């Protein structure tokens, strides 16, 4: 099997729900899972954690409009993010 190139050494996968957000931060081969609420101060806490960890890209999956407040905070804090749906 051919090995793929690493694009982001420090990245996050985020599953956004109405009242909860689950984040998997990956740094190299190490991962850390955290759960956050969806209030503004909780979104800011999550953003500070990701930025403090050196996160280079956050990819979030969301059904419905629940990703929008988080995306707006990421944009204000200059944390690169994308919305993806499988």
List the model feature ranges, each with a label.
Residues 1-86:
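Phosphate- and other anionic-substrate recognition elements at nucleic-acid/protein interfaces
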């Amino acid at each position: 099997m051919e090995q793929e190139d690493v694009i982001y050494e420090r990245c996050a996968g985020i599953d956004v729900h109405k009242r909860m957000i689950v984040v998997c931060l990956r740094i190299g081969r190490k991962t850390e899972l955290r759960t956050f609420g969806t209030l503004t101060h909780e979104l800011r806490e999550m953003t500070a954690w990701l930025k403090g960890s050196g996160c280079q890209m956050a990819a979030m999956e969301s059904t419905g409009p629940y990703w929008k407040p988080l995306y707006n905070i990421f944009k204000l804090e200059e944390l690169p993010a994308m919305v993806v749906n499988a």
